[in-house]
Amino acid sequence: MSRVISKVTTYFKQHSTAEWKHYFLSTHFWGPVANWGLPLAALGDLKKNPDMISGPMTSALLIYSSVFMRFAWHVQPRNLLLFACHFANFSAQGAQLGRFVNHNYLHYVEDPVHHKLMMKKEVLEHEHDAEVISKAH
């Protein structure tokens, strides 16, 4: 472990403080940091009902992330932070698109999130019906 730490500290010592300050104050750093909201939101949406997934928007975000992954790879110097952000978003949006297609068209895999939400809905409806009946008597 100390060998890894030694290599990391050697790497940081090779570059001056001014270079790091320039990097952390540039759009090469803050652009990807701001973009991390997209994959984080998509990952959070994996636990939501698939009825709420927008197919066209998810497809647009897949295309957007694939284009900017290519851009981040080809720009000089390479922006690996931006690449990682869009790779994560591409993966999360791909999972969402898979859920959307399965839920609306294929019905191959039972979505555990949708199943759990439907069970909660049935329990609430049953409790509501029982409450209405008890008030009627």
Curated annotation (Swiss-Prot):
Stored Pfam families: MPC
Taxonomy, superkingdom: Eukaryota
Key words of the record: Membrane, Mitochondrion, Mitochondrion inner membrane, Transmembrane, Transmembrane helix, Transport
Membrane-spanning residues: 20-42, 52-74
GO molecular function, one term: pyruvate transmembrane transporter activity
Topology relative to the membrane: Multi-pass membrane protein
UniProt entry tagged with the keyword Membrane: yes
Record localization: Mitochondrion inner membrane
A GO CC term assigned to this protein in UniProt: mitochondrial inner membrane
Gene Ontology biological process terms, A to Z: mitochondrial pyruvate transmembrane transport
InterPro entries (UniProt xref): MPC
Function, in words: May mediate the uptake of pyruvate into mitochondria.
Family from the record: Belongs to the mitochondrial pyruvate carrier (MPC) (TC 2.A.105) family.
Name of the protein in question: Probable mitochondrial pyruvate carrier 1
Organism, scientific name: Caenorhabditis elegans
